[in-house]
Amino acid sequence: RVRAEDQVTSLYGALGNYLTRNGLTLQDVRRIVLTGVGASYTEGDIFGIPTCKVDEFSASAAGALALSGREQGVVVTMGTGTAFLWAEQNGTVRHLCGSGIGGGTMGGLCRKLVGMERFGQIRELARQGDLSKVDLTIKDISQNPAATLDPDLTAANFGNLAEDATPADLAAGVVNLVLQAVGIMTVLACQACNTDTVILTGAMTTMPQAVENFQNFQRLFGYQYVIPENATFATAIGAALCSLRDTPDNNP
């Protein structure tokens, strides 16, 4: 990851980093494809290399379907915030809704609560945490919950915060809050689209808690949650695929 004060500096830094890590030069690059909100900050070709832009939603949808091998489904891109799309292999892409809860939420809360904002640091710290010292569960408030309610379900995020909660416990609570908020919205999206398939992409999919969290949603609601290989790079891969589809040539 390249950290910079502005989008353009980040772009050029990321490109240089990619070339260096892969032993490439600018002469090896035949096309540059930009996507995401940061793409709006640049115009024209980069370093004289043919450069084009692809709509982020189209890129995310194409990448998710290609990596998962699914014909259609709800695509969830968990980035700084979270976007929910309906996507089909025939090219249909519909933006369902979005949420301000995502990786940015996790980073901001953890910076204040535990003094960390780096994704890797939070991921490792949260793995050591105990959610029972942070969250209130159904079994904490009811001896006879409804049949549709698992006793271990969260009744209130941060609703049972212990005085001796450690930084690891707090980090685990933040990660759980973000993943569960996203999970609930996937249920609503599936109901709206009459589908049972959810394809998850973005950096948050690499959190160890992500698999367990969405397995719980799958068990409770019967939807299929797919985290494809290379899900972190789904939007970038989709941008490349869209570019090849829209402007095919002999030198991809």
Q: What residue spans do the PLM features occupy?
A:
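Glycine-rich phosphate-binding loops at beta-strand->alpha-helix junctions
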Residues: 34-42, 188-217, 232
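Short glycine-rich, Thr/Ser-proximal phosphate-binding strand/loop in the N-terminal lobe
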Residues: 1-13, 93
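Conserved phosphate-binding/catalytic loops in two-lobed NTP-binding clefts
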Residues: 50-57, 215-238
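Phosphate/pyrophosphate-binding loops at sites that engage ATP/ADP/AMP, CoA/4′-phosphopantetheine
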Residues: 15-30, 185-197
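Glycine-rich phosphate-binding loop plus the immediately following alpha-helix
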Residues: 90-146
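Adenine-nucleotide phosphate-binding core of ATP-dependent small-molecule kinases
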Residues: 147-197, 232
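Glycine-rich phosphate-binding/hydrolytic loop that grips phosphoryl groups
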Residues: 61-68, 106-110, 225-252
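Conserved phosphate-binding catalytic cores of ATP/NTP-utilizing and phosphoryl-transfer enzymes
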Residues: 42, 48, 52-76, 81, ...
